[in-house]
Amino acid sequence: MAGLSGRRWTGLRAALVLVVALVLQVSVLADLRVAGAIGDLLLVVVVAAGITGGADRGAAWGFAAGLLYDLVLDTPFGLTALTYTLIGVAVGAAGTAIGRTGGWWPVVLAAAAGLAQATLYTVIGNVVGVAYPAGDVPGIGLVLAAWSAVLVLPMLRVLWWVHGHSEPDRLEVLLR
């Protein structure tokens, strides 16, 4: 019974983090434009989930965060969920492949995820019939990369809390 209780708290914490991130995204970050682009806090949550839990956890968090964000965006429903899921899998797989090297690799992965998000969103959006100008991708990608790189280390601590310190050794190595 204790295991179910722990899972329930983990689920509630995860939902709380996603809802708070969404509220901050649409209320605070939406007004902090840099070169016409805004940071993506939900993307940072997905990146941190992939780093702390691997590809499976990154995919699950990516899908959930993407669907939640799709509810408030004026884009084809599922577009953000698809891109976040792909990024969660990629970051989780890269984090597993890199292993416990420590250092700045979470920041590098987060920056790469920001660039990938801008590219994937544009490519998949154009495939489903939403015309996104490809010329805007580098600028948007750089803004997303910068925001993601800055916010990923604090978000790793949040994800550690969500999962009840389930992987403290890995996180302690990451955050040294």
PLM-predicted stretches and their roles:
Residues M1-R176:
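Terminal, non-globular segments
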